């Protein structure tokens, strides 16, 4: 089934750039319909401008580093150089000549300096080898010099990673090196056992003590379902070995299947029956030659030399007794010889910044303490591509690893040395022409057709005078190219320009070929880059110039049009008449054209493309605004309502409209007919105007179609904001189609190994892309396939009827192109039918028909796709002008016979035309094929109808025209319709469906179409050449598809792909897309791979199961979640601009490492300000320098938690090692989790491992004057720790005492009755199935209460639980977890809220349940939440919230604004579940989106007892410890009530609907196996609740007190809103300024900020609180540091607010990725004014007259547009005078914060004017239309 056709869409990078831009443009033109050809041309000119939707591309090459000396020549011990030399000869990743920086690393680490290392080299520089080689060297030296020590167990190196995904990636690399059997022999020399390694993470099987039962549960399935299954599959096993995904051990011997014995029961009920005795005690034993340890128990017995783990697991390992053997063995090994040193590798070290970095820094110090060694005996190697300068890197490394600056041990920063290259040379014209004429297309097909590529190379070699290559294979050709290109002038110039730098592509071409014409320079650049990327040295795999291209795209943020048809500023060169002027992408008041035409937003009708402008009018409707009025007004509101105004030249004669005349320069609207010379133009408004509501057309006044398909549906008169995922899909498809294949195309690899890795910020976005991209592609692919199927049928003289005939031809197309389509069961059915067709007929379609072969019934998705292709408005054959549906030949003949017999006076061609129109009418009603189920019809149509079918009549407008036709009449029409119904339909009771066998599809791209000038409809035929078959008008023109700009713009996007397969014989391309996020990482411990890992393998074309197919596109979140290094990857796509440049560079760096072609990095920007900023300034993100990481080890809050951890760990380990307790059934949980919480607080009398013993132990060992632990702990605490003036020893004692007090306090909340703990369901890093008491294990209890290190991870997590009921091995049914993604509760309250759609693994669920983390078998899982609900007391009108835990006050009036206080029930979710516990039907995509509030600081009932410090004239501050914040999702406020309806038994939940509250029996949101005693449905009562979460953290609290002359009356809505905006602004600026302070230098995400307005205590004063808090629950100590540096921070805050030129806020000052939801509230000038008052007592004053005039400038422009005259007087009494006719008004402005009664503006003293008015500047900015209306009222 291999298709020999090459993909035609291949060529150079300039063509790729052009195609990406063109395809995005075509998509926008096709989806956002415009009718007028002049307007089409104008939009195209705008789209083709640089920076509208595409940014200039940048080219960048990964730098290549200088090779160093061979190992034998390095000044390192001979033992190390010998081993490294031997290993380098094995071809396992170490090369015989390391890079120079790798040599330097070896010399520094192993040589006389014995320095610790920071490997600070870039991507692709061999960082991994840079730390593995020193480890190998140390192992070799130990073997040679200390053989006795070498035989001892103990970790020689710990490799620490931030995430499991990176552990998996590193494990794969280590397997390839240390796991190689030959390498192991070399490393083993001088040792009694192989050097072993092991990964110890949450996924390592299995936690807890080993037992036969648990081996059966957790180990047996790993082997039975994976390892043993693949043992005989040599190719797959070899591939897994190659990529490091197969364990380096003797799996057969380790599993020991032969130890199991068949036995027979000799007594009891089962006497005589056989069973298997597994003898697990004799199995799972490490084999003598094993290099890898794969279970926890292996590593606990004898720890590996290399331990790979993550820092959170290392924390658990230090704490838990079960792992103590690992550290004891290492400790003994270290003691055995003073030359022994532990190596600690911190890969991706730049990630350890901020709170997480401080946590890891203290963990490292505790590790040293646990091993009882000084820091100097721990050798550290840090790696990072982004650590800033040498000094910064050194300081960071010392702080992180605890190395004192005065230590004899030093850090050496290893930086890459760029390789020295031959000098670049001036390119000759001969070289430029030879490169430009190089056959790049053939060369790009090298993976599929080596001979053609070789011929292209041979021709180039001849022209260049190079010796011809001898063709052998790809490797030989690549090596030959490498040799010949090295030293070649153009390539050396290229390397010099782009190595390690980003250069614009056009500048690159000019610099490379300055004397060549542009076209030649571009082609030569394409060839040079392609050759340089393909060239690869065989000896070490070095690519000559690994290159990537950075491309930035975005959609349109909207279109805004000048209303002057004669505008002289138009971008397009369209010479004919048009209906509007220049188009813009931003809102403007006026165009710059000669007439200064007004600019309004452009809307068009989706069906016909008719153009409208969106304006806003008052009830007088005499002036059109371009923007709505704001929400606030000092006077009576004059509401403006939206209006759609038609700007087409002629509406349809039968439509309803009113004529109006719009003044081009001002926007005045007149009912009176105006002369053309008067500056007016004619427009049309809706006929019926309803007061107070949107003024829009019910039917389009051009095409007469309804503008809404249903009452609640959005209008089809739509804006031009590019929406959805489809534009991004278009870019990804283009990106992959232009990518050269990396392997031959065959049945298993239909896309030739092409891959794209997609990154999104957000797991749900990544999941949605994985679901939606295949669906976006599917319909286009189906259209192409059906077009080819029709062509095939035509070739064998078969009619393409939409029956099984078409389905068989469709299968033939799939077979010929090795194509997969659809997914799930539908895909399986198609594959089975396709394979049967291939097997029986070798894909010969004619033969299959001759044999009357009939495939099985087509699957559901085929039927849905066929309905869409025939019936949908926009994507059907006729809708895309690809073809149409007509009667079959036989039916045409029979209908003509009937027409003649009825003596109807009509020509046969008109019967055919009417038949096609009649068929089309029925198709638009989806009345096709009665046998198709109504559920499929609903999915295809996208809407519900209770009954489907048609009356079998012409469309209403056409029927009316036909009846009025002189030669026809009503009877005539009815006879014609009856003939059509008889021959073309099946039906009964007056409901008809088109019969598939009576129809045929006509695919004809050359067909000449007809278009109606009145209604714009496109149709294949017209009646009598001139009558429109849609509306019946007699104004039809002929449209030639190849010449029509309208068809090209509107339909070209869909026509072109069909043309490519029919005319150009292109290969069909489908993409397999899967999600790859942490939410898929839940793994049943019985399976080897989580879903993500399986997808990674398929993305690497490793197909484990027979039915596996390669994944082409992997949709991920962050790079840290991609645990695979796909070196050959050449395409990355970013769905949005990442938050920081390091993120971008890391993601982009995934492409172009070792690929064979130029890599592309495509970024699609959102319309948000953060994305726009980097879209317009790509050089800042592509090549900007990363931030220097800092780790703040002086943070006492974090140190306190590590002290707690050390105390608990030491207490338990000491007592357990002393063996003072008797082993009991609880020993396992004691070893694994420090026992149960209840035992520690209320029991454990037998073991002494309880709070009383701990209390005594702390007092004896620490608090007493001779406590021995005081000094040892003080030794590992950072010297810079902020201890409040205490010595380290005294601070430690103080912390220990406070810890005891905290534990005694917590003892009161721990229940004393113990629950049974099922150890099988427990794990450390994974969520348990749920327990009666939430933190049953002591370790989890201490973590939950924030007493142990959290590593900046949220401790309050929520999960979304997807379950299924399955039959277990015992044959009974049980509930199993399918997926259980987790998020912090603050995120989950928005993303998992009831009503939200959740996409997991391409399945869509609607959140519909909120319950507790209960056991799976529990029936009523929500009861616990309702047993302990909280109260939420808040005001609807303002931000006031009262402490829910302190609600004695019964006052129900808001003390801030006077509104009514509401008391709501608030529950805190633990688990969310899907509606009805199942995924949604495909057609159900409705969701209700609600959001969680920012953290709010509830008001106490009693006065707070804070000791404030003075911070300025009107501001005080304090550092408030352990304050409670609350964050709430209030649902939607509709109908006066908000919140969610939640069942108090099962937790079934939905957004509260006051009109139809949830009630009655309902499905549970989780799986439950019903018994006879329990009904299937839950009948619990629904309650209306808020979903919320409160948490404690530390605050920096600032209190501003405002008084006269500033406004203080917060009961006034304007005053309240103004203060809230000012506080939003200062809070955001404060957060940014604090995070940038030199003592903090944090990611702003580690700080949160907020505000609250306090109740007024004194008259005419108002207190305003701002707070800055640690986002880490329990606090990270940053608020304390901020308080200590508040003067600097407040100065920086004010500078940030005043140091920008924008009006309110922008990306240069306040706007960024994370605050997009509040940017409308940010006003830097207002915030600065309030902060300046608070700090310095400066009262806002009226500005000078000229600045007032500047503030009034927008109002002035608006008034002048409306015909008023504005005179700039420039005096205090009259900054501006506005006049009309003989009346005038003096106008000024004043700061909004000034209180009106205490303030009189000078305009009120003005003379010689009829009136005066002063505007509040805050209101002026937010409600300009209102100010305009106020002036109008004064002058008219």
From Swiss-Prot:
GO CC field: cytoplasm
Q: Report a single Gene Ontology molecular function.
A: 3'-5' DNA helicase activity
Q: What is this protein called?
A: Druantia protein DruE
The Helicase C-terminal domain extends over 1014-1199
Q: Where is the signal peptide?
A: none
**Which InterPro entries did the record assign?**
DEAD/DEAH_box_helicase_dom (IPR011545), Helicase_ATP-bd (IPR014001), Helicase_C-like (IPR001650), MZB (IPR018973), P-loop_NTPase (IPR027417)
* Changes seen on gene knockout: When this gene is missing the Druantia system does not confer resistance to SECphi27 in E.coli.
């Amino acid at each position: 089934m291999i298709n020999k056709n090459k993909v035609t869409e291949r060529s150079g990078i300039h063509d790729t750039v052009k195609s990406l831009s063109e395809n995005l443009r075509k998509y926008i033109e096709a989806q956002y319909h415009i009718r007028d050809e002049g307007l089409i041309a104008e939009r195209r000119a705008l789209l083709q401008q640089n920076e509208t939707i595409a940014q200039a591309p940048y080219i960048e090459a990964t730098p290549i580093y200088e090779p160093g000396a061979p190992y034998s020549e390095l000044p390192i011990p001979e033992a190390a150089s010998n081993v490294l030399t031997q290993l380098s000869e094995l071809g396992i990743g170490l090369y015989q000549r390391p890079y120079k920086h790798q040599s330097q690393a070896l010399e520094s680490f192993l040589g006389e300096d014995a320095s610790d290392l920071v490997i600070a080299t870039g991507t692709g520089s061999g960082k991994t080898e840079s730390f593995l080689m020193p480890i190998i060297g140390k192992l070799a030296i130990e073997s040679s010099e200390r053989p006795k020590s070498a035989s001892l167990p103990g970790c020689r190196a710990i490799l620490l990673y931030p995430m499991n995904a990176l552990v998996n990636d590193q494990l794969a690399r280590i397997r390839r090196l240390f796991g190689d059997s030959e390498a192991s022999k070399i490393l083993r020399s001088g040792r009694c056992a192989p050097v072993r390694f092991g990964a110890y993470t949450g996924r390592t099987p299995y936690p807890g003590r080993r037992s036969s039962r648990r081996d059966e549960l957790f180990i047996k399935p790993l082997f039975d379902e994976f390892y043993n299954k693949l043992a005989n599959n040599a190719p797959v096993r070899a591939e897994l070995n190659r990529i490091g995904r197969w364990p380096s051990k003797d799996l057969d011997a380790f599993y020991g299947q032969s130890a199991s014995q068949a036995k027979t029961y000799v007594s009891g009920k089962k006497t005589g029956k056989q069973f298997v005795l597994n003898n697990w005690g004799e199995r799972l034993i490490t084999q003598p030659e094993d290099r890898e340890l794969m279970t926890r128990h292996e590593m606990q017995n004898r720890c590996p030399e290399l331990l790979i783990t993550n820092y959170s697991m290392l924390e658990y390992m230090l704490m838990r007794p079960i792992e103590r053997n690992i550290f004891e063995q290492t400790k003994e090994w270290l003691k055995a010889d003073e030359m022994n040193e532990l190596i600690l590798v911190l890969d991706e070290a730049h990630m350890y910044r901020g709170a997480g970095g401080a946590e890891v820094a203290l963990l490292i110090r505790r590790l040293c303490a646990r091993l009882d060694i000084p820091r100097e005996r721990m050798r550290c190697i840090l790696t990072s591509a982004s650590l800033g300068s040498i000094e910064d890197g050194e300081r960071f490394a010392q702080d992180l690893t605890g190395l004192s600056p005065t230590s004899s041990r030093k850090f050496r920063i290893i930086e890459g040395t760029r390789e020295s290259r031959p000098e670049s040379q001036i390119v000759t014209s001969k070289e430029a022409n030879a490169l430009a004429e190089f056959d790049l297309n053939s060369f790009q097909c090298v993976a599929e057709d080596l001979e053609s590529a070789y011929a292209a190379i041979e021709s180039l070699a001849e022209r260049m005078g190079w010796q011809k290559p001898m063709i052998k294979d790809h490797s030989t050709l690549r090596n030959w190219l490498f040799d010949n290109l090295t030293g070649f002038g153009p390539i050396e110039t290229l390397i010099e320009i782009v190595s390690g730098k980003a250069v614009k592509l056009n500048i690159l071409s000019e610099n490379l070929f300055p004397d060549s014409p542009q076209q030649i320079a571009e082609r030569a650049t394409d060839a040079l880059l392609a050759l340089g990327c393909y060239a690869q040295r065989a000896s070490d795999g070095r690519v000559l110039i690994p290159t990537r291209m950075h491309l930035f795209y975005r959609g349109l943020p909207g279109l805004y049009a000048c209303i002057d048809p004669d505008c002289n500023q138009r971008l397009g060169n369209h010479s004919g008449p048009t209906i509007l002027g220049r188009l813009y992408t931003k809102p403007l008041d006026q165009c710059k054209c000669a007439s200064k035409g007004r600019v309004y937003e452009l809307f068009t009708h989706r069906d016909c493309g008719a153009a409208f402008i969106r304006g806003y009018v008052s009830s007088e409707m005499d002036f059109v605004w371009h923007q709505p009025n704001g929400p606030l007004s000092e006077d009576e509101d004059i509401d403006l309502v939206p209006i759609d105004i038609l700007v087409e030249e002629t509406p349809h004669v039968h439509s309803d409209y009113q004529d109006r005349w719009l003044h081009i320069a001002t926007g005045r609207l007149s009912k009176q007919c105006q002369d053309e010379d008067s500056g007016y133009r004619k427009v049309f408004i809706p006929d019926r105007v309803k007061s107070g509501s949107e003024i829009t057309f019910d039917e389009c006044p051009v095409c007469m179609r309804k503008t809404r398909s249903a009452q609640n549906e959005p209008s089809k008169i739509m804006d031009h904001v590019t929406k959805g995922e489809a534009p991004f899909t278009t870019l990804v498809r283009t990106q992959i189609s232009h990518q050269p294949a990396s392997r031959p195309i065959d049945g298993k690899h239909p896309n030739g190994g092409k891959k794209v890795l997609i990154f999104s910020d957000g797991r749900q976005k990544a999941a949605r892309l994985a679901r939606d991209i295949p669906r976006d592609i599917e319909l286009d692919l189906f259209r192409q396939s059906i077009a080819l199927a029709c062509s095939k049928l035509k070739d064998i003289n078969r009619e393409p009827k939409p029956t099984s005939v078409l389905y068989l031809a469709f299968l033939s197309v799939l077979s010929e192109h090795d194509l997969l389509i659809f997914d799930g069961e539908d895909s399986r059915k198609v594959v089975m039918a396709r394979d049967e067709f291939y097997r029986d007929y070798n894909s010969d379609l004619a033969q299959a028909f001759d044999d009357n072969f009939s495939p099985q019934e087509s699957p559901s998705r085929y039927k849905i796709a066929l309905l869409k292709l025939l019936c949908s408005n926009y994507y059907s054959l006729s809708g895309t002008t690809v073809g149409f549906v007509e009667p079959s030949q036989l039916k045409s003949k029979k209908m003509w016979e009937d027409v003649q017999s009825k003596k109807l006076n009509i020509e046969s061609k008109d019967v055919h035309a009417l038949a096609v129109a009649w068929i089309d009418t029925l198709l638009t009603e989806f009345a096709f094929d009665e046998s198709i189920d109504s559920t499929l019809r609903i999915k295809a149509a996208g809407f519900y109808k209770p009954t489907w079918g048609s009356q079998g009549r012409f469309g209403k407008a056409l029927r009316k025209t036909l009846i009025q036709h002189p030669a026809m009449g009503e009877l005539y029409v009815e006879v014609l319709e009856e003939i059509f119904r008889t021959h073309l339909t099946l039906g009964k009771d007056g409901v008809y469906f088109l019969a598939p066998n009576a129809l045929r599809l006509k695919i004809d791209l050359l067909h000449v179409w007809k278009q109606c000038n009145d209604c714009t409809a496109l149709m294949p035929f017209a009646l009598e050449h001139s009558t429109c078959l849609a509306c019946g008008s007699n104004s039809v023109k002929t449209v030639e598809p190849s010449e029509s700009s309208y068809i090209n713009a509107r339909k070209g996007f869909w026509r072109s792909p069909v043309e490519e397969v029919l005319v150009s014989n292109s290969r069909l391309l489908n993409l397999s897309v899967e999600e790859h996020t942490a939410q898929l990482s839940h793994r049943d411990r019985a399976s080897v791979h989580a879903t993500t890992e399986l997808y990674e393998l398929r993305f690497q074309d490793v197909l484990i199961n027979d039915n596996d197919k390669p994944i082409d596109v992997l949709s991920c979140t962050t790079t840290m979640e991609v645990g695979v290094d796909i070196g050959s990857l050449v395409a990355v796509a970013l769905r949005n601009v990442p938050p920081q440049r390091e993120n971008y560079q890391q993601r982009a760096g995934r492409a172009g490492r070792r690929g064979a072609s130029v890599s592309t990095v495509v970024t699609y920007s959102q319309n948000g300000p953060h994305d726009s900023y980097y879209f317009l300034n790509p050089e800042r993100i592509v090549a900007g320098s990363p931030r220097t990481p800092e780790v703040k080890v002086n943070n006492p809050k974090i140190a306190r938690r590590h002290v707690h951890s050390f105390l608990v760990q030491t207490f338990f380990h000491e007592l357990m090692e002393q063996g003072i307790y008797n082993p009991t059934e609880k020993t396992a949980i004691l070893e694994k989790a420090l026992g149960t919480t209840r035992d520690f607080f209320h029991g454990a009398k037998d073991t002494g491992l309880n709070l009383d013993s701990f209390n005594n132990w702390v007092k004896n060992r620490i608090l007493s004057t001779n406590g021995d632990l005081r000094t040892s702990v003080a030794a590992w605490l950072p010297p810079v720790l902020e201890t409040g003036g205490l010595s380290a020893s005294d601070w430690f004692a103080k912390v220990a005492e406070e810890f005891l007090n905290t534990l005694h306090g917590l003892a009161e909340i721990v229940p004393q009755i113990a629950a049974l703990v099922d150890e099988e369901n427990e794990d450390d890093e994974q969520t348990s199935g749920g327990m009666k008491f939430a933190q049953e294990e002591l370790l989890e209890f201490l973590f939950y209460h924030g007493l142990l290190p959290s590593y900046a991870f949220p401790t309050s997590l929520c999960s979304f639980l997807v379950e299924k009921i399955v039959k277990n091995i015992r044959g009974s049914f049980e509930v199993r977890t399918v997926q259980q993604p987790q998020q912090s509760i603050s995120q989950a309250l928005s993303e998992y809220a009831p009503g939200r759609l959740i996409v997991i693994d391409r399945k869509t669920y609607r959140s519909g349940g909120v319950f507790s983390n209960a056991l799976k078998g529990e029936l009523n899982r929500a009861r616990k939440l309702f047993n302990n609900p909280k109260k939420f007391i808040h005001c609807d009108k303002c931000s006031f919230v009262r402490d829910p835990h302190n609600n004695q006050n019964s006052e129900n009036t808001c003390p801030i604004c006077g509104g009514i206080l509401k008391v709501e029930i608030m529950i805190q979710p633990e688990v969310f579940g899907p509606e009805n516990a199942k995924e949604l039907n495909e057609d159900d995509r409705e969701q209700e989106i609600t959001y969680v509030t920012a953290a709010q600081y509830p008001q106490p009932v009693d006065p707070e007892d804070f000791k404030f410090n003075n911070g300025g004239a009107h501001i005080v501050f304090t550092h408030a410890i352990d304050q409670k914040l609350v964050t709430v999702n209030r649902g939607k406020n509709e109908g006066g009530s908000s919140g969610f309806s939640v069942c108090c038994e099962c937790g079934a939940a939905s957004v509260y609907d006051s009109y139809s509250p949830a009630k009655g029996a309902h499905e549970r949101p989780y799986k439950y196996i019903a018994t006879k005693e329990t009904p299937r449905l839950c009948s619990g009562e629904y309650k209306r609740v808020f979903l919320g979460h409160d948490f404690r953290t530390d605050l920096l609290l600032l209190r501003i007190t405002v008084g006269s002359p500033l406004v203080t009356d917060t009961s006034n809505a304007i005053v309240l809103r103004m203060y809230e905006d000012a506080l939003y602004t200062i809070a955001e600026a404060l957060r940014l300024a604090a995070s940038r302070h030199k003592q903090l230098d944090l990611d702003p995400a580690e700080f949160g900020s907020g505000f609250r307005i306090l109740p007024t205590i004194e008259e005419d004063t108002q207190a305003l609180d701002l707070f800055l808090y640690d986002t880490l629950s329990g606090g990270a100590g940053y608020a304390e540091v901020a308080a200590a540096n508040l003067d600097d921070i407040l100065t920086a805050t004010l500078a940030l607010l005043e140091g920008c030129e924008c009006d309110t806020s922008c990306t240069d000052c306040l706007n960024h990725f994370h605050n997009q939801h509040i940017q409308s509230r940010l006003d830097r000038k207002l915030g600065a004014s309030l902060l300046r008052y608070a700090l310095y007592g400066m009262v806002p004053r009226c500005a000078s007259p000229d600045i007032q005039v500047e503030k009034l400038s927008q109002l002035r422009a608006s008034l002048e547009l409306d015909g008023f005259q504005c005179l700039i007087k420039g005096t205090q009494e009259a900054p501006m005078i506005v006049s009309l006719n003989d009346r005038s008004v003096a106008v000024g402005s004043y700061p909004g914060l000034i209180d009106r009664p205490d303030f009189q503006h000078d305009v009120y003293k003005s003379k010689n004017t009829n009136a005066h008015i002063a505007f509040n500047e805050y209101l002026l900015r937010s409600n300009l239309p209102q100010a305009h209306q106020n002036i109008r009222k004064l002058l008219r």
